[in-house]
Amino acid sequence: MSGSAVSKRYASALFDIAVETSQINEIEEELTVLKEVFRNEAGLQEVLSHPKVSAAKKKELIQQSFGALSESVLHTIFLLIDRRRSSIVPDLTDEFIKLANQARQTEDAVVYSVKPLSEAEMLSLSQVFAKKAGIASLRIRNEVQTDLIGGIKVRIGNRIYDGSVSGKLERMERQLAGGNR
């Protein structure tokens, strides 16, 4: 079974538990933190995948490092350790977030701007682009990109709405280059 299929199965099972226990948001937050740690700490993944380190030692390491995790997440990580699949935690997290967003009828979006946006600006953008995307709401994260010159660029899933000055200049350049042929 492919890694993504396995991640989907574990994410789906964990999501079912999250729904039953009304802990979707809490589990999503915990998984997001775990994902960052797994991605940024190569040593952790090395230890968890090392064949000479016993499963009990690996679980003890997780328990000591992430003792504040909910029982559901902790048991899922332990199960992944037992089945030698701890490397799928980042993919499992992504799949869990997709399921949670579907249940909430929301999506995550990144708004790139030249300067940080205010809460009011982000709320307004959330409402406008939620309508465009045909969903109930957007959870917006703002990233500053000074190379945009002005305007904004919004990424929702794999869709990009580019209203930046640099994007407009690039489109004009392509049109002019295409017209000279």
Curated annotation (Swiss-Prot):
Record flagged with keyword Cytoplasm: no
Which of UniProt's keywords are assigned here? ATP synthesis, Cell membrane, CF(1), Hydrogen ion transport, Ion transport, Membrane, Transport
**Mind telling me what this protein is named?**
ATP synthase subunit delta
Q: What does this protein's UniProt record list under function?
A: F(1)F(0) ATP synthase produces ATP from ADP in the presence of a proton or sodium gradient. F-type ATPases consist of two structural domains, F(1) containing the extramembraneous catalytic core and F(0) containing the membrane proton channel, linked together by a central stalk and a peripheral stalk. During catalysis, ATP synthesis in the catalytic domain of F(1) is coupled via a rotary mechanism of the central stalk subunits to proton translocation.
Protein's cellular compartments: Cell membrane
The annotated topology with respect to the bilayer is: Peripheral membrane protein
Its cellular-component GO annotations read: plasma membrane; proton-transporting ATP synthase complex
Q: Which family does it belong to?
A: Belongs to the ATPase delta chain family.
Tell me the Pfam families matching this sequence: OSCP
Q: Name one GO molecular function term.
A: proton-transporting ATP synthase activity, rotational mechanism
Fetch the Gene3D superfamilies from UniProt: N-terminal domain of the delta subunit of the F1F0-ATP synthase
Which coarse location class applies to the principal site listed for this UniProt protein?
membrane
What SUPFAM superfamilies does the entry give? N-terminal domain of the delta subunit of the F1F0-ATP synthase
**Disulfide bonds listed in the record:** none
State whether it acts alone or in a complex, and with which partners, per the record. Answer: F-type ATPases have 2 components, F(1) - the catalytic core - and F(0) - the membrane proton channel. F(1) has five subunits: alpha(3), beta(3), gamma(1), delta(1), epsilon(1). F(0) has three main subunits: a(1), b(2) and c(10-14). The alpha and beta chains form an alternating ring which encloses part of the gamma chain. F(1) is attached to F(0) by a central stalk formed by the gamma and epsilon chains, while a peripheral stalk is formed by the delta and b chains.
